[in-house]
C-alpha cells in the first residue's frame, strides 16, 4: 500500500452497544476513497498492522458493529480511508490515507450494583455506576408484597443525573408511597430505547426520618444525650457517631416514665470540643436483611 495525502482523514466516533461496539465514520471531504480499514487495539500507541486490523468496509458503510469485542473492556479504535482502484507506474495498487485520531471506546460498567436510599417523604435516590453510552435510564418500581400496587415507570435523561464522584451517579425519584416495601429495576437505554445494561435490583422500605429529635451535651461530663419519638411498625434503629475518625454506635433503649413514647441513648464525647456528626435511621427487617428509612444527621460540639 502507498500513502496518498489527498485521500484525507476520517473522523471516528465509538459507542458501546448491547453486544460489542459501534463505530460511526465521518468520511473525508476529498471523497476519493473506496472504503476504510478498521483497527482495534488495547494499547493507545498502537501502529496499524495486519495484527490489529479487524475489518475493511466499503465507502457506503459508515456504521460498523464490532460484535466480537468485549464491551466490558476498553479498546482504542481508528480508521483510515483507502483507494483500492489506485495505480502506480501501470500497476494496480491500494492507496491509504491518514489514520484517524484514536478513539477510546468507553466500556459498559462491570459493577451493576445499585444502592437505594430513602431520601425524604416519598423520595428515593438510586446510586450506581454510569453507563457512558446511555442516552437515558429507565426505572421500574414495583411492590413485591402488594399485589394491588400499580407498577411505576420513570425515564431519566442521562444528562440530568446527579454526579456523586468517580463514575458514580444518582437519580432521584419522588412521589412514591410511604410505608411500602419497593423494588427498583434500573436499565440503561440508547436513544431508541434499546437496552444497553440491566443493573441489579435494589430495594427500599419507605420509612421517614425519626421525629422530635433532641441532642444535648452535658458540659461537665461531656456525655451526649439523645432522644426521639418512637416510630410505629419499625424493627429497630441505628445511631452512629464519628469520634476521632472512627464510627461508633450509640446504644438506644426505650425511655421510662414520661419518656415511654421515646427512644433514648447516650455516649461520652472527648473532652476536647469539636464538631461531632451523628446519624439516626429506623430499619425494618425482611428475612435476614435490614432496610433503612430516611437518615437524619446532626452535628454537636
Please tell me what each predicted stretch does.
Residues 38, 128, 139, 173, ...:
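Gram-positive cell-envelope targeting signals
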Residues 29, 42-46, 83-87, 132, ...:
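Solvent-exposed strand-loop boundary residues in beta-sheet-rich modules
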Amino acid at each position: 500500500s502507498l500513502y496518498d495525502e489527498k485521500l484525507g482523514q476520517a473522523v471516528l466516533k465509538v459507542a458501546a452497544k448491547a453486544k460489542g461496539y459501534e463505530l460511526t465514520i465521518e468520511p473525508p471531504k476529498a471523497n476519493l476513497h473506496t472504503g476504510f480499514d478498521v483497527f482495534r487495539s488495547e494499547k493507545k500507541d498502537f501502529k496499524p498492522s495486519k495484527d490489529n486490523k479487524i475489518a475493511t468496509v466499503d465507502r457506503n458503510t459508515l456504521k460498523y458493529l464490532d460484535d466480537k469485542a468485549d464491551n466490558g473492556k476498553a479498546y482504542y479504535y481508528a480508521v483510515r480511508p483507502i483507494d483500492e482502484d489506485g495505480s502506480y507506474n501501470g500497476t494496480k495498487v491500494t492507496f491509504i490515507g491518514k489514520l484517524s485520531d484514536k478513539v477510546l471506546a468507553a466500556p459498559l460498567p462491570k459493577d451493576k450494583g445499585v444502592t437505594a436510599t430513602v431520601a425524604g417523604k416519598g423520595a428515593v435516590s438510586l446510586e450506581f455506576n454510569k453507563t457512558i453510552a446511555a442516552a437515558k435510564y429507565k426505572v421500574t418500581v414495583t411492590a413485591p408484597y402488594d399485589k394491588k400496587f400499580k407498577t411505576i415507570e420513570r425515564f431519566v435523561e442521562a444528562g440530568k443525573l446527579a454526579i456523586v464522584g468517580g463514575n458514580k451517579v444518582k437519580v432521584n425519584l419522588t412521589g412514591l408511597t410511604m410505608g411500602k416495601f419497593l423494588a427498583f429495576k434500573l436499565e440503561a437505554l440508547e436513544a431508541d430505547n434499546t437496552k444497553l445494561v440491566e443493573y441489579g435490583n435494589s430495594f427500599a422500605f419507605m420509612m421517614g426520618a425519626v421525629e422530635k429529635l433532641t441532642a444535648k451535651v452535658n458540659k461537665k461530663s461531656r456525655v451526649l444525650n439523645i432522644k426521639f419519638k418512637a416510630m410505629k411498625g419499625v424493627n429497630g434503629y441505628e445511631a452512629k457517631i464519628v469520634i476521632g475518625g472512627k464510627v461508633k454506635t450509640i446504644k438506644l433503649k426505650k425511655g421510662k416514665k414520661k419518656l415511654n413514647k421515646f427512644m433514648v441513648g447516650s455516649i461520652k464525647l472527648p473532652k476536647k470540643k469539636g464538631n461531632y456528626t451523628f446519624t439516626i435511621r429506623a430499619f425494618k427487617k425482611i428475612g435476614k436483611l435490614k432496610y433503612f428509612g430516611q437518615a437524619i444527621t446532626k452535628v454537636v460540639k
